[in-house]
């Protein structure tokens, strides 16, 4: 697989780890924006996009873009403590970067590109290990909440309608 890497600072050094792989590494400079790097990578034959560290709003935007159109899959690092924190942080980055104006749409886009969260931790010797793997399954909201319970005359009727609504 061909690797396409975008970093804000060269720190992955994957050519040392995978010397026989076809690797294209790019980073933002004073004259070349990170978005331009990503646009070039979209035009290359890359199977895997790796975003060095998603620590700023623009970099989060690049990650979402590359995951949607640029490769078979995208890997990235982030320092969120939990999976819900990761979704919230990426959603907020999309909003602050101006990519989306609506929280719901931004969160849906984030959740669509996150398949798994592989959370690493360090042991007391400083070695990393996989603490947990969380699968992200988008919830498809097919039913809207109705207010039929309001027209019921009795409390039992209201409760029955309310729970029917909540469980279907």
Predicted regions and their residues:
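Switch/coupling sub-region of P-loop NTPases
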Residues: 1-109, 121-122
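Well-ordered beta-strand positions
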Residues: 116-118
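NTP-binding/hydrolysis catalytic cores, primarily Walker-type P-loop NTPases
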Residues: 125-168
